[in-house]
């Protein structure tokens, strides 16, 4: 069973929920379901650990961060396998990109924490204004389901490196790698209570965490609606919010089309398209639109959809049935709105092995001749669906591409 990680040890809960493999639909195991009680324990541990950790020399914190980064690097195969099992992300992406990036996050912020320089400003002959950076205190870190381990380290590394303590709340949809981070942190020498991890649902564990009066700052990655609710709930705390997106890609006629095609395919179809930075709207100058569209659709059709654990797979499974229904719902909307379907669509990918029969697989889907005011161009889909939009040079302007 996946438990909480509080004050340097595993902690159980009275309630549990079941975690599933999105590629097969099979149960992975039970997960502790935390609430206000577990959050209170975790915040208390973080609060108790804060004074000593905040006063630990930056050079010592940096050394511990580098050690944790090295331990993650040593465990890349194991962590990548867990991440793929949990999320449906292709193993070649978790093994070669996401977990190594998690290691790099700790190395990067190990350097940052020893170089936090303030500034001074002479006001007159008798007065000097200066800035001094100090740790905030207990931070609530809320990580999403799509790239859970990498995003968790993206939050944890700067938080801990700069002298804060943390309570990390993972998504209930992808909890497997969380306690691995807790165990590796202890192995690296990070004191108990500095990093605490609570599993559970957003409505219970997440809500209790952001409301807790001893939490001084909140870092949240997830949906825009949830981010707004957190700010309404938590009041005057410090925030770092990474919310929804509908990122544009611009293709001009003088672009290197080979490089542009590779980059555009990567931005939308890597990580199964389940990324807030997905390049889901591609604006293409009219003079090169036919050529770009033809080749882009052909390359999308050649992408390999299949078992996330197979190194050849390029697009894996959606995280849940509910999310699959959302993404396919937008494909239906695109068809109803009159966009031209050039690749993918609603048909299940062909030739999937029998053990993936219950998986949530969607073909890379390409809509061409999209009007930027269509819903598929205005609303975040969070899946392998892209809009190709022809546009004249005079309309390739910021007001056009950011009109969402």
Q: Where are the predicted features?
A:
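Terminal low-complexity tails and localization/encapsulation signals of metabolic enzymes
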Residues: 1-30, 63, 67, 117-142, ...
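N-terminal alpha-helical segment of soluble enzymes
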Residues: 22-87, 287
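Residue-level signal for inorganic ion chemistry
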Residues: 25, 61, 83, 163, ...
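Long amphipathic alpha-helix in the N-terminal Rossmann-like dinucleotide-binding domain
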Residues: 44, 66-77, 91-116
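Rossmann-like NAD(P) dinucleotide-binding subdomain of oxidoreductase/dehydrogenase enzymes
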Residues: 117-259
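ALDH superfamily catalytic-core signature
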Residues: 217, 225-371, 390-396
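Single conserved hydrophobic/aromatic residue that forms the stacking wall/gate
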Residues: 395-404
């Amino acid at each position: 069973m996946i438990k909480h990680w509080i004050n340097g040890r595993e902690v159980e809960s009275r309630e549990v929920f079941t975690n599933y493999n999105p590629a097969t639909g099979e149960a992975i195991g039970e997960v502790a379901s935390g609430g206000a009680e577990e959050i209170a324990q975790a915040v208390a541990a973080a609060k108790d650990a804060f004074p000593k950790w905040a006063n630990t020399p930056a050079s010592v914190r940096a050394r511990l961060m580098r050690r944790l980064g090295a331990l993650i690097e040593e465990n890349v195969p194991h962590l990548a396998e867990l991440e793929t099992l949990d999320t449906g992300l292709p193993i070649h992406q978790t093994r070669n990109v996401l977990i190594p990036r998690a290691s790099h996050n700790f190395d990067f912020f190990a350097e940052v924490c020893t170089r936090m320089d303030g500034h001074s400003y002479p006001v007159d002959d008798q007065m000097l204004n200066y800035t001094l950076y100090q740790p905030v205190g207990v931070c609530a870190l809320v990580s999403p389901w799509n790239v859970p381990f990498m995003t968790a380290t993206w939050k944890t590394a700067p938080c801990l490196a700069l002298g804060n303590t943390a309570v990390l709340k993972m998504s209930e949809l992808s909890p497997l790698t969380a306690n691995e981070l807790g165990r590796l942190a202890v192995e690296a020498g990070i004191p108990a209570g500095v990093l605490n991890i609570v599993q559970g649902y957003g409505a219970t564990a997440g809500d209790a965490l952001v409301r807790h009066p001893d939490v001084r700052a909140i870092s949240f990655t997830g949906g825009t609606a949830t981010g707004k609710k957190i700010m309404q709930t938590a009041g005057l705390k410090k925030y770092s919010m990474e919310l929804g997106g509908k990122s544009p890609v611009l293709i001009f006629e003088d672009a290197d089309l080979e490089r542009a095609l590779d980059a555009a395919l990567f931005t939308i179809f890597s990580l199964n398209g389940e990324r807030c930075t997905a390049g889901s709207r591609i604006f293409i100058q009219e003079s090169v639109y036919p050529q770009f569209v033809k080749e882009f659709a052909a390359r999308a059709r050649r992408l390999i959809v299949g078992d996330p654990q197979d190194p050849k797979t390029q697009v894996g499974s959606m995280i849940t049935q509910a999310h699959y229904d959302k993404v396919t719902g937008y494909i239906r909307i695109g068809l109803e709105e009159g966009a031209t379907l050039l690749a993918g669509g609603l048909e299940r990918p062909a030739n999937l092995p029998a053990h993936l029969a219950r998986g949530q697989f969607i073909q890379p889907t390409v809509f061409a001749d999209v009007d930027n005011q269509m819903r598929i161009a205005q609303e975040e889909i969070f899946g392998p669906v892209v809009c190709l939009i022809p546009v004249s040079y005079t309309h390739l302007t910021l007001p056009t591409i950011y009109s969402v």
